[in-house]
Structures are given as structure tokens and as C-alpha cells.
Amino acid sequence: MSSFFLSISPLVLALFHVVVQVCSQSCQVAISELQSERKVIILNSDKRSLKQPSNGKYSWKSGESIYFICGKDLKTLTCSPSSINAKRFDCVKPPDVTERDINRECNGKSSKTFQMGFRASGGLFVPYYELCYLMDTCSVSHVKHRLLGASFGGVSGTREKSFQSFVCPGLRYNTHYTQASQKQPDPRFYFQRGHLFPDRDAPVFAWKLATYSYGNCVPQWNTINSEGGNWWTLEYLVFKYAQQTPNTEYTIYDGVLYDPRNKQYLAKQEKKIEIPVWFWKVVTNQTHVLKVFFVSHNLKGTKQTFCNTNRCVNDRAKGTKTVETWDFYNEASRGITHCCYWKDLARKNPLPIEVQREINNKKN
């Protein structure tokens, strides 16, 4: 038996040498080394789409062209394993985050679909995610983004960034979100900028900057939006689920429902930036709808439900571990939450028709 292993050992060593040689002939940069807003936007070879990291790093073969945006400039490097490292991707300026109107309705006649992404000189625009905006009230309807667990590699969240204004000229988005402007009767409760596409889901630090737009947030009670609230908890659970299933790419839809019979606005005088009564999230993969979640925005609680059967658990307690994947707090101030399969919505589906049509193309 030992002579057999001795006889093949040269072959094994040769194969090992080839593997090592192939690995040494590639360029790799960990996304954990790109934790600065003044880092590049790395592109695919088409130079018009974002390159997705794998297992927390970018990789190129020796001699392969590396395309990236630095500030507003499109640049190119050639993969040379001895010379490519994170320092080669330092930029003087951060990426230019902007939106592009793609001229498509998404929730009624007053709605417009926008792509959020990064702009470079020469008219180049690289899209990242898509959002639906209600132009008459300057309010968000819903947002769609991709989530791939294998992309991540220890990238922390951004510090609280200034949100970028959106497409309603003259509207003082930032002012209306201040506590002084809101004048809430109980100072414990006030509206925050509720992310729809959370920056946590963006694997690359510079990509996170694109989520800080007023086109991607709605007024949300602080006790629901902050850590310990059910919307924050839902974002966290979806993110962890994606990391535990790293080979599956998810498409996430995040949106809100407004009350047409009792409209409330953050900008009261202008009747802009509508305050939602529900938040919703749909998690899908390439062929199936995993679940649809609803989080109430009523601090006094609600008996309304959109699901025939609640497939979430509502016995989460602060400071204790839970074995359930989808477990939430049963407290109105944190946002009463229920969830179900897409088919469980039956005739009660409250989502925009355009979203329903897109999701119905998947197998449920």
C-alpha cells in the first residue's frame, strides 16, 4: 500500500504545484480593505455594470484588465499579482451617486422608476438598484435590490451619512426629518429616515453610499427603525439568512403602504413625504418567493392582517436567544409583524400591481 502512495506522490506534488502556481498568478483584493468612501467602484469587463465580489474579495486573472471608477473618472489597470493591492484603489474623491429616470410607471400615473447608481465622465452611468417614486407627494413606493450572501467579507456599516436630496426641487427633505421640525407630543417617539434598501445589504463600503438617498427612505418611528425594532430585526434576519445560503442570489423588494383615506405628511404644509401605515418586504430567489413580511407602523397596534396564516413567530424577547428563523417582538411600539407565503395572500394582496406582476412570474 505504501509503495502505491509513493508511486503517485510525484503526481500529487505536481498537481499541488500547478494549483499554487495558478493561485499565485491571480490578483485579489479583500473588500474589507476597501472600507472608505474614497474607494473605487469596480466594474465588470463591460464597464457598465458592478463587479460582484465573491467570498469577500475581488479576483482577476494575471493579465486581465481591471476597470473601475475613481471619483468621476473611468480607469484601467492590468492584473499583475506583484503590484495589485488595496492602495492602488485609493481615490481623491468619493464616487458620484446619482439617479436616472428610466421612464416607466411603477405604481400608478404619478409614479416614476429610477435607477440609483454611480456616474462617471463621458456620460457613463452604472446602475445599482431600482426604486419607485410617487412624484405628486414626493414619497417612496418601493425599492428593489439584489442580495448575495457570498459577496460579504467583514465590511462594517457606514457611519450615519448625510442623506442626498432627491428629485423634488425646493423640498427641504433634511429639515422635515429633524425632531425640532416634527414637534412630536411625546419626545420618546419621532420619525427617523427609514431605509428601505438597508446599507447592511451592500457588500462593498462605497456601494453603501448609494443607499443614503431620500429616494430610499420614508418616515419611520424610531422605535421600529432602530435596533430592537421589528423593521431593524427583519433587515438583520434577512441578511443573516442570505449569509447562511451563500450560493443563492436573492431579489429583495422593500416598500410601504399609505392610507388613501387618511393621508398624513411629514411636510404638512406642502403635503409632501407621506407617512406610511405599513412597511412590507418580499424575499425572492431566482425561481421562488421565500416570504412576504408586513410590519405595522401604528404605535397603538393593529388587528389588520394581510396573510391568511401568520408564518412568523412573535415571542422574541430582548437578551434571549431564539431558535426560530423569523421571530419578532410582539409589541406595538416595535411594529407588529406578520408574514406568510406569497400564495397565502390570496385576494388580500395589497402590493402595487406592477410588483405583483413581476413576482408572479416566479414559481411560488
From Swiss-Prot:
UniProt entry keywords in alphabetical sequence: Endonuclease, Glycoprotein, Hydrolase, Magnesium, Nuclease, Secreted, Signal
Any GO CC annotation of this UniProt entry: extracellular region
Primary location class: secreted
InterPro entries according to UniProt: DNA/RNA_non-sp_Endonuclease_sf (IPR044929), Endo_G_ENPP1-like_dom (IPR001604), His-Me_finger_sf (IPR044925), Non-specific_endonuclease (IPR040255)
Broad class of enzyme this protein falls into: hydrolase
GO biological process terms held by the UniProt record: apoptotic DNA fragmentation
EC assignment: 3.1.-.-
Annotated GO MF terms: double-stranded DNA endonuclease activity; metal ion binding; nucleic acid binding; RNA endonuclease activity; single-stranded DNA endodeoxyribonuclease activity
Subcellular location: Secreted
UniProt tissue specificity: Saliva (at protein level). Female salivary gland.
Cofactor: Mg(2+)
Keyword Hydrolase found: yes
Region forming the signal peptide: 1-24
Glycosylated residues in this chain: N285
Family, per entry: Belongs to the DNA/RNA non-specific endonuclease family.
Function: Hydrolyzes double-stranded DNA with no sequence specificity. Does not cleave ssDNA and RNA. May facilitate blood meal intake by lowering the local viscosity created by the release of host DNA.
UniProt name for this protein: Salivary endonuclease
Originating organism: Culex quinquefasciatus
Phylogenetic classification of the source organism: Eukaryota, Metazoa, Ecdysozoa, Arthropoda, Hexapoda
